[in-house]
Swiss-Prot record:
Function of the protein: Implicated in the export process of the lantibiotic SrtA.
Cross-referenced InterPro entries: AAA+_ATPase, ABC_Gallidermin_ATP-bd, ABC_transporter-like_ATP-bd, ABC_transporter-like_CS, P-loop_NTPase
GO molecular function: ATP binding; ATP hydrolysis activity
Keyword terms: ATP-binding, Bacteriocin transport, Nucleotide-binding, Protein transport, Transport
Family: Belongs to the ABC transporter superfamily.
Ranges of residues in domain ABC transporter: 2-225
Record's protein name: Lantibiotic transport ATP-binding protein SrtF
Keyword Magnesium tagged: no
Length: 229
């Protein structure tokens, strides 16, 4: 589905990403894990066209990634850009109209994220968790091949975190390809099929994950190994 080879990103003399290599298989959940400032968001911003790469190769569906592929990628990188005085439905309608997608897709997508039965109240009255779920519904309007979620549970209360986990689990059961980032290992250990540990701008470990290993222990051991190299 997606292969990243020798990806670099620098700002002047400051290197943010240093020869990053990743392989995200189709139909799997790939968890990008690392501390704040490790480079997780930079990778996701490059993949969604928000930031340009310095060098390296990105292969998407068997060919070199280009900006035309952005229509095939749904994403929540920062707080969703919502119209706060409009309802969830009307927010969706704005985007379907802009993209030329049938309005009939709106309610099924709202149901998919647990927002199909809410009233017409404006988004400004929503909790952060509801805004995140609406953002995800909007990101699915174009039927993307890849869904990218950058620390989607950040700032949510326990109820919001659980609701979002259940939604991602339902996407996983449908075979959707998802890339999710987090610095909290417990948030992804039940979701991930593959893990990539990023530390100081480098992928220090990438492997298939079946849930049998303790992620925190695995990550800490890998960091110790890197520091000793």
């Amino acid at each position: 589905m997606l292969k990243i080879q020798n990806l670099k990103k620098s700002y002047g003399k400051r290197t943010i990403l240093n020869n990053v290599n990743m392989n995200i298989p189709k139909g799997k959940v790939y968890a990008l894990i690392g501390p704040n400032g490790a480079g997780k968001s930079t990778i996701m911003k490059i993949l969604t066209g928000l930031v340009s790469k310095t060098s390296g190769s990105i292969i998407f569906e068997g060919r070199e990634w280009s900006r035309r592929d952005l229509r095939k990628i749904g994403s929540i990188i920062e707080e969703p850009p919502l119209y706060k005085n409009l309802s969830a439905y009307d927010n969706m309608k704005v985007v379907t109209t802009m993209l030329g997608v049938s309005e009939s897709t709106i309610l099924p997508l709202l149901n998919k994220v647990g927002l199909g039965n809410i009233d017409k109240r404006p988004v400004k009255q929503f909790s952060l968790g509801m805004k995140q779920r609406l953002g995800i519904a909007i990101s699915l309007i174009n039927s993307p091949k890849l869904l990218i979620l950058d620390e989607p549970t950040n700032g949510l209360d326990p109820i919001g975190i659980q609701e979002l986990r259940e939604i991602i689990e339902s996407f996983k059961s449908e075979g959707m390809t998802i890339m999710i980032s987090s610095h909290i290992l417990s948030e992804v250990e039940h979701l991930a099929d593959f893990i990539g540990f990023i530390y100081e701008g480098k992928i220090i470990l990438e492997k298939e994950y079946d849930g049998s290993e303790n992620l925190e222990e695995l990550f800490n051991n890998q960091i110790l190994f890197e520091k000793r190299r």
